[in-house]
């Protein structure tokens, strides 16, 4: 993980660690002119590692985004941001996206009153995301909400931290996307 964030920069969904400043100066191979191929590859790798996708999953999302109306890049980022694991991370119910994936895989999360155990589940507007009524599930979410620094919540999401409930209001705006992509 640390090699990846050192190479690609800060990936907030991947880990809470940040790369040290000045690390580029120590490695002379990283400096110099960057080719177009290298820039595109690094941006693709940022997407993959930030959202925890395989190469095949990312290609499938790109195909869906190409078929949709609008800018392919914007539609792709909207698709990735509306995944259940990412929404849990944005709500603060998990400290990282891999942590959110684990919550979903272990069946702690309900969407509209039904257990969903697929992290790539695509949330829609007016979806209600809650935890199971079990004490263990609530404790996991409570620890995550308490330990996470309170960042500004995107306007397409609402959270009720006392009931451990989140609501998807609308599809995300491009200005709320947390990853800087070139």
UniProtKB/Swiss-Prot annotation:
Cellular component aspect of the GO annotation: chloroplast; small ribosomal subunit
Region described as Disordered: 12-31
Subcellular location: Plastid, Chloroplast
Keywords, ordered alphabetically: Chloroplast, Plastid, Ribonucleoprotein, Ribosomal protein, RNA-binding, rRNA-binding
Protein task: One of the primary rRNA binding proteins, it binds directly to 16S rRNA where it nucleates assembly of the body of the 30S subunit. With S5 and S12 plays an important role in translational accuracy.
Assembly description: Part of the 30S ribosomal subunit. Contacts protein S5. The interaction surface between S4 and S5 is involved in control of translational fidelity.
HAMAP family xrefs: Ribosomal_uS4_B
Protein name in the entry: Small ribosomal subunit protein uS4c
Gene: rps4
